[in-house]
UniProtKB/Swiss-Prot annotation:
Sequence positions that bind Zn(2+) 2: 171, 198, 252
Binding site residues for Zn(2+) 1: 81, 83, 171, 325
Free-text cofactor note: Binds 2 Zn(2+) ions per subunit.
GO molecular function terms noted in the UniProt entry: allantoinase activity; dihydroorotase activity; zinc ion binding
Pathway noted in the entry: Pyrimidine metabolism; UMP biosynthesis via de novo pathway; (S)-dihydroorotate from bicarbonate: step 3/3
Name of the protein described by the UniProt record: Dihydroorotase
InterPro entries per UniProt: Amidohydro-rel (IPR006680), DHOase (IPR004722), DHOase/Allantoinase_Hydrolase (IPR050138), Dihydroorotase_CS (IPR002195), Metal-dep_hydrolase_composite (IPR011059), Metal_Hydrolase (IPR032466)
Membership in a protein family: Belongs to the metallo-dependent hydrolases superfamily. DHOase family. Class I DHOase subfamily.
Cofactor annotation: Zn(2+)
Source organism of this protein record: Ehrlichia canis (strain Jake)
Gene Ontology, cellular component aspect: cytoplasm
Alphabetized UniProt keyword annotations: Hydrolase, Metal-binding, Pyrimidine biosynthesis, Zinc
CDD domains the record matches: DHOase_IIa
Described purpose of this protein according to its UniProt entry: Catalyzes the reversible cyclization of carbamoyl aspartate to dihydroorotate.
Length: 447
């Protein structure tokens, strides 16, 4: 059992406050550093690290010493796909509760999706998100702005980028209009920012509920065919081919056919990136039978063949990063029949241990897995985080890699508990989360 505690981030650590992290296994996935040593922070920055640091003793001027007890000290996770529901649906989640959940999961930076009420398609809403983050967050809050306004016209992308947007998407819904998508890709290339697509042809998905296949037929439910995803991926890649310097990102990819198209585009030199969720790496349509509406998500859990393709795509680099699509819902929207229940699961507090299953079962190396959770997502949104380097922001976590525990949704910090991973036995526990040099979360074992 662990006692958990949190501290709001505010403006980060005091400028002159120093912290020495000793007896650490320091891992930096980008440089492939993996050493036993120490690390020093001052204010919000990493000052120094190495095997020989503090060999002559820790200076008395150091304000705080944290003994890592040979656990891993690594960059904090970066989740570029979360729904914090604020403004408009604060009964599901808020920036406060969502970021508290992130801190508990070792996630030091999140990117909020813009399908709030109202959407992040105006400067006013963008400013509101930034204000609420400063007031109530435990981690760094970034946001995508909407590609379109409520009337389906193009958002003022230049002003929204200036207001802090790290990219553009209509996630929750696709951009179905090809002309609008082409215009968004064109403008984004001029702004040097990313356009992210929720790839779903609504005519083909046709208000389906789960993957079209064996399980949908067995349960008598309308299915969502995998071509509804791949056809939009194919269309968008065709649209970007004649636009210079454009970056196109596919959210929560789920089908083998989509991956084949993405692989071909990358081989042609196009700047195409994509993400996969932990649940699409570990669950299939069969889990809908076991977990019911807790396994109802969009895109749906697909076949075992698709799942294996996701794992292989992550290993070989076709898939760039892991992101949760953290989608909180209150109980009464999930305790319904499959054909009426809401889509989505929460994922911030299970992101790391579920992803680590791929390491613990020998599928992928630890360094390569952690890369997809740290600097690789940072590269997609162009933020200087996810690395251990001198002068870089001190966004760090301490991880007990082999600690075994059982997921308990009732202990989630998130306001919502909709997860199919309840009672799953996992390995890997976040003991401390440090954001801008400031500890915002600790888990201390009860004796």
């Amino acid at each position: 059992m662990y006692k958990q505690s949190w501290k709001l981030l505010g403006r980060g650590q005091d400028a002159d406050f120093t912290v020495a992290y000793i007896n650490a296994r320091i891992i930096d996935p980008e440089s492939k550093l993996d050493i036993i040593g120490s690390l020093l922070t001052k204010g919000d920055k990493i000052v120094d690290f190495g095997q020989d640091l503090f060999n002559n003793g820790i200076p008395s001027t150091i304000d705080e010493v944290v003994d890592c007890n040979n656990n891993i000290l690594m960059p904090g996770l970066i989740d570029i796909h979360v729904h914090f529901r604020e403004p408009g649906q604060e009964h599901k989640e808020t920036i406060h509760t969502g970021s508290k959940s992130a801190a508990a999961g070792g996630v030091t930076t999140v990117v909020c999706q813009p399908n709030t009420i109202p959407t992040i398609s105006s400067i006013i809403t963008a400013k509101y998100i930034k204000m609420r983050a400063l007031e109530s967050a435990y981690v760094n809050i970034e946001f995508y702005a909407s590609i379109t306004k409520p009337d389906n016209s193009l958002s003022d992308m230049a002003l929204l980028k200036e207001a802090g947007a790290v990219g553009f998407t209509d996630d929750g819904m696709p951009v179905m209009n090809s002309l609008t998508m082409r215009q968004a890709l064109s403008y984004s290339s001029m702004l040097d920012t990313v356009v992210a697509q929720h790839a779903e042809d609504l005519n083909l998905s046709n208000n389906g509920h789960i993957n079209e296949g064996t399980v949908s037929y067995e349960l008598g439910l309308k299915g969502i065919p995998d071509i509804s995803e791949s056809i939009i991926v194919n269309r968008d890649i065709a649209l970007m081919k004649n636009i210079k310097n454009v970056h196109y990102h596919i959210l929560h990819v789920s089908s083998q056919d989509s991956l084949n198209i993405i692989k071909q585009a990358k081989n042609q030199g196009l700047k195409v990136t994509c993400e996969v969720t932990p649940h699409h790496l570990t669950l299939t349509e069969q889990d809908v039978i076991t977990h019911g509406t807790l396994a109802k998500i969009n895109p749906p859990l697909r076949t075992e063949n698709d799942r294996l393709s996701m794992v292989e795509g992550l290993k070989n680099g076709i898939i760039d990063c892991i992101a949760t699509d953290h989608a909180p819902h209150e109980v009464n929207t999930k305790e319904l029949p499959l054909d009426t229940a809401a889509f989505g699961i929460v994922g911030l507090e299970t992101m790391l241990p579920i992803s680590l299953e791929l390491y613990h079962n020998g599928t992928i190396s630890l360094i390569d897995l952690l890369a997809t959770l740290t600097y690789k997502p940072a590269n997609i949104i162009k933020v200087p985080r996810g690395r251990i380097k001198k002068g870089f922001v001190a966004d760090l976590i301490i991880l007990d890699l082999n600690h075994e525990w059982t997921i308990d949704i009732l202990k989630f910090a998130s306001k919502s508990k909709n997860s199919p991973f309840h009672n799953r036995k996992v390995k890997g526990k976040v003991l401390r989360t440090i954001v801008s040099g400031k500890t915002t979360y600790t888990a201390v074992r009860n004796i």
